[in-house]
């Protein structure tokens, strides 16, 4: 909800200029708090129930989306969040391995597909970046029927 409030999905945007910002896809999810160095522009982190896994107990995760490049070419161009738990960051280019799948984006599916991606990389002789965490990406609004949803798991790779 923090990101939705920042961009003004349901009410007045919670940013220093009260500028409404278009929602973009994908929305990224990753487990674990950290310094956010790997988090795209428009990131929020904290301890919440994963919106993609409502049956889960509260977990710490990061949620992020990409700012529209047509309006904000760098993080400093974007309106400043009024909520200190929302951060805006530039993310350097990186190489990600991606596995696409359909269905609901649940923690069990993320874990299974992430492991499948790791095994495929290993079989192809591609190394995941040391300490890389699986990220989940959802491309559809919540009201999309489960069988029409497009999701991805992503893992940063090194040496490519």
Locate the predicted segments by residue.
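A solvent-exposed interaction/effector surface
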Residues: 1-160
């Amino acid at each position: 909800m923090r990101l939705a409030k920042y961009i003004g999905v349901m009410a007045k945007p919670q940013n220093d200029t009260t500028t409404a910002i278009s929602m973009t896809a994908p929305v990224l999810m990753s487990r674990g708090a950290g310094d956010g160095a790997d988090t795209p522009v428009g990131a929020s982190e904290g301890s919440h129930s994963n919106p993609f896994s409502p049956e889960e107990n509260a977990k710490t995760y990061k949620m992020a989306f990409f700012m529209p490049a047509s309006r904000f070419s760098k993080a400093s161009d974007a309106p400043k969040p009024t909520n200190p738990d929302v951060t805006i960051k530039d993310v350097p280019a990186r190489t990600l391995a991606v596995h696409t799948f359909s269905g609901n984006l649940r923690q069990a599916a993320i874990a299974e597909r992430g492991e499948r991606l790791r095994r495929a990389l290993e079989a192809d002789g591609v190394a995941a970046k040391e300490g890389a965490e699986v990220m989940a990406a959802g491309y559809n609004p919540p009201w999309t029927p489960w069988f029409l949803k497009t999701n991805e798991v992503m893992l940063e790779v090194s040496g490519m």
